[in-house]
Amino acid sequence: MISIIVPVYNTATYLPQCLDSLVNQTYRDIEIICVNDGSTDNSPDILKAYAERDSRILVIHQENLGLSDARNKGLESARGEWVMFVDSDDWIGTDCCKTLLSHTDKQTDVCLFSYIREFANQSFPQYLFSDKKMVYQGSSIHWLYARLIAPNDQELRLPGKIDSLSTAWGKLYKTSLIKEHGLRFVPVRQIGTEDLLFN
């Protein structure tokens, strides 16, 4: 099973598209954990309506504690072998979960995937790597570590690429890796970027 954690805060405009992309996954063995982080728009009503139609959706309500706390709350409820994060103003392709699982084996800890930045009149594909699949080991893993920790020269020149590796979304994580090591998101107010430290 894949646990999909969706932190929600005042994204009613985009939330239906996000949830539709999740409930319509071709890989059906998923749970969708939506953490409403104190939304003041009609996001809670949208979440309630979707949860009433699909038993795979769990809605958790909390006061507005921030993105990190919402993701951590979702992790507490995750029951899947795998976990992924989808922001509530994003959506994923209908074969996303199926495709990701097809690239995993018993030794996989995390599977990263590319994404598209959507704007009103343009789309910008963001490719993480040039190859379709890469396994990092030996000396090549040091390059990956450096990329996860800080932006490289190209990213500093093109800031739109900075989040390509450091985000929580765009990845399928082995749940046991997160839970056994007690990994959690540190609130952004403490470190400035919650995704980077988690990764």
Predicted feature locations:
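Short hydrophobic beta-strand elements that form part
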Residues: S3-V6, I33-C34, H61
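Donor-binding/catalytic cores of nucleotide-activated saccharide
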Residues: L67, S88-N199
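A conserved acidic beta->alpha catalytic loop
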Residues: S21, R28, N36-D45, E63-L65
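Short aromatic/hydrophobic "clamp" motif used to bind/position activated sugar donors
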Residues: V83
